[in-house]
Amino acid sequence: VHTTQFAIREPKHGLFRPVLRLVAEALDQHEAKSRNIPVRIAGICGHTAQATAEATMARELGYHAGLLSLAALDKADDDALLAHSRAVAEVLPILGFYLQPAVGGRVLTYRFWRRFVEIDRVIAIKIAPFNRYHTLDVVRAVAESGRDDIALYAGNDDQIVLDLLTAFRFQVGGRLVERRIVGGLLGQWAVWTHRAVELLEQCHALANTGRAIPADMLRLAAEITDANAAIFDAANGFAGCIPGIHEVLRRQGLLAGTWCLDLHVRLSPGQADEIDRVCRAYPHLTDDDFVASLR
């Protein structure tokens, strides 16, 4: 999602199916060489007709699930949102997606999420409202549902480390229920991905000990948030989020440029300087050497 763009769906570009097919082919090659079988997740957008068509296409191309954006249904009430979600889930298992309003999402209440997790073919939720209250709404809804087969994924790029380390506990029916966010579907992890894998493993290891969070992890959490602010262009309401990701990949030689399908989307003034700053300040967050070793 973060290294393509929502605009691939527009008829004038016609890139949605080619992109899904290309990724599927790359995953096929990976599976042929490795014992690891990745979960294949396609982004699903639009009103019900478009979303079910995209889900059908993804299923035909071998995808296991769809990450369901509700951004297009910005005026719909909970009943309509749930009917839409059920329709897509009939085609393909779904991951819920709480997208922050600053980039086209909408506020989704605890009551919505409590009903959403009653859909049988919901297998996970990406939590990305960039809001602590709204994050808790989702985790509590899952905890109170009694379902332990729904995975929670971090999407709050401003709080990656603490989301992965926190044990969320709620009283449910007189007993204590604990849920954890088990992984991330993060734009920040579209870059410096080798380090992201190491970070996730480190967070899992710490969480499994049950010990207090070390001070160096709290410091690392702040450093990653600072780096993300530059890459995502937080100072300008995330206007340069996609080209910011592209710029990091360009510097590593993985992309030829930062162009976007929407020609108006480009790096914000001063954003490249901010990326320079965080790269100098936090070289341990980058994976330039790893990328260079594979070229």
Description of each model-found segment:
Residues 1-113, 264, 289-292:
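Active-site beta->alpha loop and helix N-cap motifs at the rims of alpha/beta catalytic domains
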Residues 19, 116, 275-276:
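A structural signal for short hydrophobic/aromatic patches embedded in well-ordered alpha helices
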Residues 23, 27, 31, 142-143, ...:
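Hydrophobic, Leu/Ile/Phe/Ala-enriched alpha-helical segments that form helix-helix packing faces
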Residues 26, 202, 251:
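Active-site catalytic microenvironments for nucleophilic, acid-base chemistry
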Residues 28, 32-34, 144-150, 207, ...:
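Structural alpha-beta junctions
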Residues 87-90, 95, 100-241:
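Catalytic alpha/beta core domains of metabolic enzymes, predominantly
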Residues 226-295:
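C-terminal extensions of enzymes
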